[in-house]
C-alpha cells in the first residue's frame, strides 16, 4: 500500500533511543551551585553577570562578583581599609537630637475616602461582614 503523503521525502522516524543517545553525548550546559543554607540552584554556562538575593545573601555568577562577595585574596572585602580620621559633622539645619519624637496625625472616626462612595454600610449583616472578611 502506498503512502497517502504527497511528499516522497518522508521517511521512517528516528527511534527514540537514538535521539536520547545524541542528547546524552552533548555537553551539560549548566552547573549546580550549592549554597551555605542548604539550597542549590543550577546556573546555565552561558549566563553571566546576573545575580540574585536569597535569604538576605547576594549570590552572583560572574567571576568578578564571586571575587568581591565571596572573598578571594584580591577581594575588597578583605582589604585592610583604614577608617577615615575625620568625621563628617552633622548639618546645622537637621534635627538630630535623639530625644525628639515626631508626633503622628490623629486617626479619625469618620468615613475614609475609600468608603465615602459606598452607601448603607450600616445596613450590612453579620453574614455580609464575614463574607467580606473571607476575601
Curated annotation (Swiss-Prot):
This is Transcriptional activator protein. Its main location: host cell. A zinc finger (unnamed) spans 37-54. Residues 120-135 are annotated as: Transactivation. A motif (Nuclear localization signal) lies at residues 17-32. Residues 1-14, 77-88 have a biased composition (Polar residues). Strong activator of the late viral genes promoters. Enhances the expression of the capsid protein and nuclear shuttle protein. Acts as a suppressor of RNA-mediated gene silencing, also known as post-transcriptional gene silencing (PTGS), a mechanism of plant viral defense that limits the accumulation of viral RNAs. Suppresses the host RNA silencing by inhibiting adenosine kinase 2 (ADK2), a kinase involved in a general methylation pathway. Keywords: Activator, DNA-binding, Host cytoplasm, Host nucleus, Host-virus interaction, Inhibition of host innate immune response by virus, Metal-binding, Phosphoprotein, Suppressor of RNA silencing, Viral immunoevasion, Zinc, Zinc-finger. The keyword 4Fe-4S does not apply. GO terms for cellular component: host cell cytoplasm; host cell nucleus; viral capsid. It is found in: Host nucleus; Host cytoplasm. It holds the Pfam family Gemini_AL2. The zinc finger and the transactivation region are involved in PTGS suppression. Belongs to the geminiviridae transcriptional activator protein family. The keyword Glycoprotein does not apply. One of its GO terms (biological process) is symbiont-mediated suppression of host innate immune response. Monomer. Homodimer. Homooligomer. Self-interaction correlates with nuclear localization and efficient activation of transcription. Monomers suppress local silencing by interacting with and inactivating host adenosine kinase 2 (ADK2) in the cytoplasm. Interacts with and inhibits host SNF1 kinase. Binds to ssDNA. Phosphorylated. Residues 1-23, 77-117 are annotated as: Disordered. One of its GO terms (molecular function) is DNA binding.
